[in-house]
Amino acid sequence: MTNPEFSSIEDFAIAMDEHDPLRNYRDRFLFPKTANGEHCVYLCGHSLGLQPITAAEYIEQELKDWAELGVEGHFQAANAWMPYHRLLTEQTAALVGAKPIEVVVMNSLTVNLHLMMVSFYRPTPARHKIVVESGAFPSDQYAVKSQIAFHGYDPASSLIELSPRPGESCLRDEEINLLIERSGDEIALILLGGVNYATGQAFDMKELRTQVMLRAARLASIWRMRPATCI
């Protein structure tokens, strides 16, 4: 199925939607309505996803268990609260391509990012810079800047934001490689999104990680996969 077979881009889009094996999943979510009462075209899933129709039912169940069981809900609720994260392990592992033993669902995204940087961002006077893509999600930027400041450095000089070339919207791999070659001795951490939440650019994580290891053995890298799993 190719675009030239259709009289307009709209016809092509409609045909593709009709043949999408996942199209029925659309009916599982609640869509905000426009001023004229029609369902809006929602393209903000990378920021806040639509509410699943079943969300209220699941929340009501937890409130019911809380009301009837109190503290005993940690172990006796319909979905016991203490081991609740285990209910999500198998699905999350499949989503991110990991083994279940490698996955745990916990905290908020920003808290987890802080925990990762506490472990992997070990700045020294000679090597203290962090590399992120320009236009990274705001809460990610705040976390990075706060970690830099916590260690006594200035985000104005210790944060490197990679930007696309003028007139382009996506970063080139060679630009990242060039930065590592030029400033690798000053960089303590490279922190990129698997997919850029604003542009949709997907990075070749395996290749970039290989280049990092070849060029700077002491350089750590973290991949933020939140945008890659919610777009």
Which residue stretches match the model-derived regions?
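Pyridoxal 5′-phosphate
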Residues: 1-231
